[in-house]
Amino acid sequence: MSEISLIMLAAGNSTRFNTKVKKQFLRLGNDPLWLYATKNLSSFYPFKKIVVTSSNISYMKKFTKNYEFIEGGDTRAESLKKALELIDSEFVMVSDVARVLVSKNLFDRLIENLDKADCITPALKVADTTLFDNEALQREKIKLIQTPQISKTKLLKKALDQNLEFTDDSTAIAAMGGKIWFVEGEENARKLTFKEDLKKLDLPTPSFEIFTGNGFDVHEFGENRPLLLAGVQIHPTMGLKAHSDGDVLAHSLTDAILGAAGLGDIGELYPDTDMKFKNANSMELLKQAYDKVREVGFELINIDICVMAQSPKLKDFKQAMQSNIAHTLDLDEFRINVKATTTEKLGFIGRKEGMAVLSSVNLKYFDWTRL
């Protein structure tokens, strides 16, 4: 049995997919797409090593300890080159995680022809008339190249050392004078590029699990600046001490959303030792945090917030706070509830030394079946 390692490319920005969620984090059942695709291929062969390129290593590591992860580059070629640094097997198989449903039959065709060339690649024939600059091309000479592809590791490394931009391994090796061997591709190995492609693939739908997160934050009064809650000015001078603008509600809500998604906490994302967050707009930071949560495949169901303050009174501001949260997070206002309470003059809140906020949120997986 030949010694083969597997590289799965999962660091792309999903620009052409044109949704808030990156396609590699679409949920198939409970698995993100990148994991589903990697599990599928890894079940076909005892790979020496499995390497996944990533733009979010710490989060992806939460799903499995069976693979190695490496930060991707700005391009496919850069990501692959970095991953190859971890590979020392004679052969390497490379695939895009966006090719989710590669079959065992296609995989076997690649393995069976391993000794035929320097790179073995699947390809589809073109059935339709094909034009280039309004001129018909000879479709018999056209191939639609797919992945996974198997290459001789040393030759692929050498090809990528040219620092040219190749869109797949076979063209990189061909540019070095290497021999390419084509096997029959398959429709199921088509790349998921546009959201419309989801309708062409028979994929498991997202599970209906709900993920709950809580956030709690406290700040002391003392700054001669506006008191902001959810970006709404409550008082012109009763500001809270903080590195940012002191919006304790936004901080609490940010923590709740990050926690529900398993993405850490506000201090990790926006450390108070970083001067770029000095006096930062906390509602903008909240939006950025939720964008990160959506990128990895979640969306909000509802928000419930309890503001604890002896003073000032907040009754007249609750509606404005709910509206501003809804606008910031692109969420229906009926899914947001803001409550206010005192501590009956007990503790630091009762002594009007500061205020606290407790936020609870529920998330679900992004439902890509609605696209």
Curated annotation (Swiss-Prot):
EC number: 2.7.7.60, 4.6.1.12
Binding, a divalent metal cation: D217, H219, H251
Pathway: Isoprenoid biosynthesis; isopentenyl diphosphate biosynthesis via DXP pathway; isopentenyl diphosphate from 1-deoxy-D-xylulose 5-phosphate: step 2/6; Isoprenoid biosynthesis; isopentenyl diphosphate biosynthesis via DXP pathway; isopentenyl diphosphate from 1-deoxy-D-xylulose 5-phosphate: step 4/6
Cofactor or coenzyme needed: a divalent metal cation
InterPro entries in alphabetical order: IspD, IspD/F, IspD/TarI, ISPD_synthase_CS, MECDP_synthase, MECDP_synthase_CS, MECDP_synthase_sf, Nucleotide-diphossugar_trans
Protein name in the entry: Bifunctional enzyme IspD/IspF
Reaction catalysis annotation: 2-C-methyl-D-erythritol 4-phosphate + CTP + H(+) = 4-CDP-2-C-methyl-D-erythritol + diphosphate; 4-CDP-2-C-methyl-D-erythritol 2-phosphate = 2-C-methyl-D-erythritol 2,4-cyclic diphosphate + CMP
Protein family according to the UniProt entry: In the N-terminal section; belongs to the IspD/TarI cytidylyltransferase family. IspD subfamily.
A Gene Ontology BP annotation from the UniProt entry: isopentenyl diphosphate biosynthetic process, methylerythritol 4-phosphate pathway
Entries under Pfam families matching the protein: IspD, YgbB
Residue ranges, annotated region (2-C-methyl-D-erythritol 2,4-cyclodiphosphate synthase): 211-371
Region (2-C-methyl-D-erythritol 4-phosphate cytidylyltransferase): 1-210
PROSITE patterns named in the record: ISPD (PS01295), ISPF (PS01350)
Keyword Oxidoreductase: no
Primary role: Bifunctional enzyme that catalyzes the formation of 4-diphosphocytidyl-2-C-methyl-D-erythritol from CTP and 2-C-methyl-D-erythritol 4-phosphate (MEP) (IspD), and catalyzes the conversion of 4-diphosphocytidyl-2-C-methyl-D-erythritol 2-phosphate (CDP-ME2P) to 2-C-methyl-D-erythritol 2,4-cyclodiphosphate (ME-CPP) with a corresponding release of cytidine 5-monophosphate (CMP) (IspF).
Site positions for Transition state stabilizer: R16, K23, H243, T342
